[in-house]
Amino acid sequence: MRTIWYAVFVISAMIGAHSLRSAGKTLDFYFVDVEGGQATLIVSPDGRTLLIDTGFPGSGTFQSTPGDPRAARDAQRILAATRSAGVARIDTLVTTHFHADHAGGVVELSQLLPIASFVDHGAVNPEAETNVKGTLDVFARYAAVRAKGRHTTARPGERLEADGFDAVVVSSDGRTISRPLAKATGRNPACAAALPPQDIYENPRSVGFLLSFGRFTFLDLGDLTGAPLFALACPDDLLGHVDVYLVAHHGGPDAADPATLSAFTPRVAILNNGRTKGGGAPTFSALHRASEAGPSQLADVWQLHRSSNQGAQNFDDGRIANLDESTAHWLKLSASDDGSFSVTNSRTGETKTYPVR
């Protein structure tokens, strides 16, 4: 963990270095509805921005191509979140991997908002095209936008600590950290065998982060699945307990390993699923089992969409941002550096507060 990479320095400086001056202010997360892709906007107390992924291009499918940014579904939804947050640029864009539902929206978004720096796992494996058609085109378009800003390739273990804020890369390009972080809990009794990934080329290469803001922790692993996801939890937990876990791969069936929930033990899990994309029945079952173990294990699960997948055990409607595809509400999380946080459903206006653990 010796290397200090530029984007983490920017993130740490923009959030950590201002934490004392911004006492009492929150680190805000907007989980934008991109129909089962990802776009998570993080806004520091002083208004700096980190965006994790940009959703789909165009009309919002894997077959869509970039077009008029004024008509771009996901870029416009991200733009709406930035306006709600009162910000007008993206300081750092982290692209977890190069599938269209994570990297496709960058062309149109870059025409709506300036993007200063880019972080990703490097380049796409040409074999990725054999499993998810269009991946090479998505990467080529992304790389053309990336070339206009600063670029950093993320590597596991790279980090920088500053004034209580910590950003650690825990996975990238198919590799993970090999040594436990400070709060890791050791041997994981829930380990069995790794679930096979639905995609063997890009998803397991996802950039994953453990972000901390004072005592608050948030884990985002992109679409990390298969052996790399398993390696973070088994045979030993390498990360430790987290406050909020954005469930890997939109809660797809290959992210349902109960060993990960045992290792990460989130207070709150968030599913960035769509109506049919992500939100697999095995993951719902694993989350329900964890929540039934008591609030000390998993207090709540919040969903971006009600799932219509066969066997999906949706959680309470009050914890779901969109009940169908006619709306595009987000979930907003506001974290304090004492470890407390709140989640707001923008559809209902309901806010639930989670006190210091």
What do the predicted segments below correspond to?
Residues S19-A23:
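Sec/Tat signal peptide C-region and signal peptidase I cleavage site
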Residues Q38-L41, G349:
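Gly/Thr-rich phosphate-binding beta-strand-loop-beta motif of the actin/hexokinase/Hsp70
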Residues V32-A39, D46-S84, T95-Q111, D173-A286:
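Active-site-proximal loop/helix segments of hydrolase catalytic cores
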Residues M1-W5:
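Positively charged n-region of N-terminal signal peptides that target proteins for export
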Residues G24-L27, A81, A103-A227, E292-R357:
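Flexible, acidic/histidine-containing loops and adjacent segments that form or flank the divalent-metal
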Residues Y6-G16:
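Bacterial N-terminal signal peptides
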Residues R89-I90, P114-I115, H241-V242, P266, ...:
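Local beta-strand N-terminus motif with an aromatic residue
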